[in-house]
Every structure is written in structure tokens, then in C-alpha cells.
């Protein structure tokens, strides 16, 4: 954009600032306002941490109650936020559009490159926010064990968010209360991600239907890499 909403970071924050001023005014003292934001977009030319820290400072100054720290860009860097490999066979299996299915089969691994999974993969960047931002921060990304969650909370984060760990084991939080070494059984095949664009998100451990053999083999391959 070439107008007052594009170009410099200050201009690009203008619309956000206008919106958040109205949101905070409407919320008053009755509603807690959390903002989920990227620390990095995860692709060349996207926002990096120097700029997003400025965004966080602006949100803090606007009176936001907490920030949820994430990253990635679904259309350009989906695995930056999800981590691991995209299960291309699963993704195309559930597609109805024949030409899209064919195109993803041919170029999917180039279009959606793998980003290796590790526990708490956003923690290094999130700690930079923790040292600069005073309002509550909620950590998200790669939490699959009580031990790592305890580590994150001990670093000063007020709360954590989980997704795939709870898809894999809905009672995982209750098990963590009982077991100090609790760890979910998610194998990071990303089957749940592969199907979420066409049907409901679900872990392959909790399906009513039987998986086709080709998808079983893909899951086994990805989980044993």
C-alpha cells in the first residue's frame, strides 16, 4: 500500500491501533482482551522479531490484557507454525477438487517444505518478548510433556496453550496432574493437519472410520522418521 496504512511499521500498525482502541473501549472492565500475534512470519520478506516486538509494545500501551505468542503464515509458511512434514497423501486424499489434488501431489513437497519439530520450538523467540513485555504472555508451540510445560512456566509465562497434544489425548491435562513425567503420545505425523482443510480436524488414533492402507503407511513413515 502507498497510503497512510502501508510502508513504514508505524503506518502498518495504524489500522491495528484504531481497531484496538475501539475494542478496548467496548470491552471496558468487563472483558479480558487477549491478542494472538506472530513473533516471526517464517518466510523471506515477512515480519521479523524486531518489528513484532514493536507491535507487542504498542498493544501493551493500548491496554491489552495478554498476548498469545505464535508464528507462521498459513498460505506461505504453514509448517513454521505446525512443524514437521505435511502429510501430502493425507492432504490430497480428502480433497474433492481434482486439479488441486493433482497439483498438490506433484508439487506439494516443494510448496510446503518440512520444518523440523522440537519441543517448545517457539521458546527462544518468546523469551525475548518475556524480557521486554510486562503484561501476561501465553506460550504456544510444541508442548507435549509436563516437564517442558513446567520449564516454560518457570521462565515467567503466565499460561500455555496446546492443540495437537489434546487432539491426541483429550485427558492429557488430567494425566499431567497425576504424573510428573507425563508425555502425550502424539507422533507428529500431522495427519490431523492434513485433513483439517477439507473435513473436521481429528487425530488418527480417534477415528470412527478405518484409515485406507496408503494413509496408514504414510503415518507410520512420518512417525518413524
Pin down the residues of each PLM region:
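Flavin-dependent oxidoreductase catalytic cores
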Residues: 1-225
